[in-house]
C-alpha cells in the first residue's frame, strides 16, 4: 500500500468507528474525512459531527440519503422480488452499495487516497463495501482496521478510547443491547449474544420495530397500495415519496406484528450465521408487488423473472450490486415493469399479510369473459384444447412407445 495522506471513513459515531478515527490518525499519520449517512437507521446522526470535531477531523460529511436509498436501491430490488435463500429480504445487503458509492465520490472530491470502514473480517459487509468501491474506483485503496489491529474485544476498544480521550459515552454501557444491531429504513438486524446458539429463542424484548403477533390488534387493518411501473407510489390514495412509503408501511406492519424473521444463512465468506430481522414494510411490499404483477405480466415474462430472481438475490447478497451482470439483470427486470400499474388491497392481521384484491384499469391481462366458469358466449372454444394437448403430449407418447421406464 502506498503512502496514505487522507482517508474517507464510513463513520457512525459509535464505539468502533470512533476508535477507527484515532487509530487511522495514529497508525497512518493521515488526515481523516468522516462520512455519516442517514439511511433511516432511526438514530440522530448530527452528534457524529461533534465527536468527529473533537478528534480533530476537519472535513465532515453528514448526508440524508433516505430518499435516494429507497428510490434507487430498495425499489429496484423489490421490482425483482428478490429473496435470498427463500427467506431473507436483503435489508443489510441493499444498504451497502450506496454507502460505497458515496465513499468513493467523497474520496474523489476531497483528494483522498483511501477509504475505510468498520466491517469485521468475518462478515459479508467488508466484501460488499470493497467490491462496490473497486467497481466504481478501481485505483482506490481500502483500509479495513478489523483485519489489521489487535483490538478484538469491546473491552480493548473501550480501553483504547479511555487512553486517548476518544469521545464515547460509556455511562449507559450496562444498558447496551447484548446483540450486534444494524438498521436502515428497510430493516433492523440482530446478531451475536444468545443468538449464536441457533436453538435459543430470541427474547421478546429484543424486537424493536414490531409487536408480537399475539399482541397485535384483534381487528384487521386493510390498506390499498398504488403502483406505477412496479413501484409503490401511494397508500390508501395518498401519494407519497419512496422514503415516506416505506416509513408508513414499517409503521403499519410493525403495529400488526408483521415482518419478524429468524434464520440461519450462508455468508459469502463461507460460514453459517444466525440472524434475526424485522422488515415490516418490505414484508408487505413483496406480496403486494407479486400480486400486481400477477395481473399485469404475461406468463412467460413472469416466469422468466422468477428464474433469474435467485441469481439477482445472490449477486446482491454477495456484494455485486455494481457488477455488469447485476446491471444487465436490472435492465431486463425494469423492462418488464412498464405495465405493472394498478392497485393492490391487503389485509394485515396478527403477523400475516394477505392479498385480498388487485386491479389495473389499463394494464390488466385478466379477461373475465374468457376465464369465467359460466357461459363465455363463444369467447373461448374448448375444443381447441384437444389439439393443444395432443401436440404437447407428442414427445411423451413417442418416449412411451420405446418402452422407457418412468421411474
Swiss-Prot record:
The keyword Magnesium does not apply. GO terms for cellular component: cytoplasm. L-citrulline binds at residues 88, 93, 124, 128, 180, 189, 265, 277. Pfam families: Arginosuc_syn_C (PF20979), Arginosuc_synth (PF00764). Its EC number is 6.3.4.5. Signal peptide: none annotated. ATP binds at residues 10-18, 37, 118. It comes from the Bacteria. GO terms for biological process: argininosuccinate metabolic process; L-arginine biosynthetic process; urea cycle. InterPro entries: Arginosuc_syn_C, Arginosuc_syn_N, Arginosuc_synth, Arginosuc_synth_CS, Arginosuc_synth_type_1_subfam, AS_cat/multimer_dom_body, Rossmann-like_a/b/a_fold. CDD domains: ASS. Keywords: Amino-acid biosynthesis, Arginine biosynthesis, ATP-binding, Cytoplasm, Ligase, Nucleotide-binding. L-aspartate binds at residues 120, 124-125. One of its GO terms (molecular function) is argininosuccinate synthase activity. It catalyses: L-citrulline + L-aspartate + ATP = 2-(N(omega)-L-arginino)succinate + AMP + diphosphate + H(+). PANTHER family: ARGININOSUCCINATE SYNTHASE. Belongs to the argininosuccinate synthase family. Type 1 subfamily. NCBIfam families: argG, PRK00509.1. Homotetramer. This is Argininosuccinate synthase. It comes from Alcanivorax borkumensis (strain ATCC 700651 / DSM 11573 / NCIMB 13689 / SK2). The gene is argG.
